[in-house]
């Protein structure tokens, strides 16, 4: 009986020693957090292994993550994964539909991002920029001929339209001369003509009936306007004036001293044509509602695909600029030692307990062997 008790006692003692040895060894990975000194001498195994090698550990983990986990190829493959693309597209589409149920004006949106008085500030910026650009254009192009400023397509279009302008002028002239107003105007011109020529005019009026004479002039005027030579003359005059206009420099039409005033006027006119009140106060959803289907079916998938493709193409440069190894190292370095210990225990707690138990089992087994050997010796 004493032999069996001795063997069991040795097994219990060996198991306890083995378990405690492993438990202490595991604890010494983290504890103590700081070096302990006795008589100005640092005690061995202080601080613990992980606190002592913390910086080195963080550096190596960062290198391992970049070299074997977050590699350029792995990142590129993930970015080009169709499932990821679909997930991102679905998420953005869902967010877009949620936002479309709201009523958010550009003013409110800009206010949300800290841009106060958006409408006033934006219009002031547009007005200032527009006036500056017009002034710059007038100053830099003042010696340029109008023929060089007018686009070739517009110049050709205007040149081909001159005959139509001639037709319109003669048509308007015919309508006016043939009208009652035109007849009255001709009569008044005749009366004024006779009055301006004194006695000779008065004598002529004695032999001429103004009403019939004005009708005659009206008829002859209509014949003259309708003649092809008249149309050719008008067309020639228009062509000549157009050529003269093209030959002039910009400063001949707009003198330097009037440029600033003209720029201000043009800017004011252009600003007034902008529907800025509607633009800044109409809900964005109202503007986009007609394009909602196109945005969800085409724009969002295309934008996501292009974005992921761009990031994948430049993944090497992005990873290099981000310096992921340094990022991981820095993040690990920010963890406190209790946090690192807690993290490791949460991940490997079961395995660490098994190591402790294994130490107890091995210690107990060794104790049994020692007990048996002690009986034999």
From Swiss-Prot:
- Here the disulfide bonds are none
Q: What keywords appear on the UniProt entry?
A: Cell membrane, Membrane, Transmembrane, Transmembrane helix
Give membrane topology per the record.
Multi-pass membrane protein
| Pfam families in UniProt | DUF445
One GO location term (cellular component):
plasma membrane
Record has Metal-binding as a keyword: no
Primary localisation category? membrane
Transmembrane residues, as ranges? 1-21, 357-377
Keyword Transferase belongs to the record: no
Q: Where in the cell is it found?
A: Cell membrane
Give the UniProt family note.
Answer: Belongs to the UPF0754 family.
Q: Which protein, by its recorded name, is this?
A: UPF0754 membrane protein lmo2224
User: What organism is the protein native to?
Assistant: Listeria monocytogenes serovar 1/2a (strain ATCC BAA-679 / EGD-e)
């Amino acid at each position: 009986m004493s032999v069996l008790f001795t063997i069991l006692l040795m097994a219990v003692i060996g198991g306890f020693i083995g378990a405690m040895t492993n438990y202490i060894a595991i604890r010494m990975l983290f504890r103590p957090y700081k070096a302990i000194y006795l008589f100005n001498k640092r005690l061995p195994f202080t601080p613990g292994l992980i606190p002592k090698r913390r910086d080195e550990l963080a550096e190596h983990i960062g290198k391992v993550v970049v070299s074997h986990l977050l590699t350029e190829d792995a990142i590129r493959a993930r970015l080009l994964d169709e499932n990821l693309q679909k997930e991102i597209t679905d998420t953005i589409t869902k967010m877009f539909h949620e936002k479309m149920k709201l009523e958010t004006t550009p003013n409110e949106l800009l206010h949300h991002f800290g841009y106060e008085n958006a409408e006033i500030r934006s219009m002031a910026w547009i007005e200032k920029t527009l006036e500056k650009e017009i002034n710059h254009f007038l100053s830099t192009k003042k010696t340029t001929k109008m023929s060089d400023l007018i686009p070739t397509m517009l110049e050709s279009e205007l040149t081909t339209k001159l005959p139509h302008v001639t037709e319109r002028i003669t048509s308007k002239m015919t309508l006016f001369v043939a009208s009652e107003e035109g007849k009255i105007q001709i009569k008044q011109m005749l009366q004024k003509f006779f009055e301006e020529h004194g006695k000779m005019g008065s004598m002529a009026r004695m032999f001429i009936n103004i009403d019939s004479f004005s009708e005659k002039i009206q008829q002859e005027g209509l014949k003259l306007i309708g003649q092809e030579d008249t149309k050719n003359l008008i067309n020639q005059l228009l062509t000549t004036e157009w050529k003269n206009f093209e030959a002039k420099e910009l400063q001949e039409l707009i003198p330097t001293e009037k440029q600033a005033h003209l720029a201000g006027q043009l800017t004011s006119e252009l600003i007034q044509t902008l529907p800025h009140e509607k633009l800044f106060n109409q809900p964005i959803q109202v503007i986009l509602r007609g394009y909602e289907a196109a945005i969800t079916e085409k724009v969002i998938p295309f934008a996501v695909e292009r974005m992921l493709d761009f990031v994948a193409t430049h993944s090497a440069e992005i990873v290099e600029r981000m310096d992921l190894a340094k990022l991981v190292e820095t993040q690990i370095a920010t963890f406190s030692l209790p946090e690192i210990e807690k993290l490791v225990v949460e991940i490997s707690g079961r395995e660490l307990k098994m190591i402790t138990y294994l130490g107890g089992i091995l210690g107990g087994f060794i104790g049994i062997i020692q007990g048996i050997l002690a009986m034999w010796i």
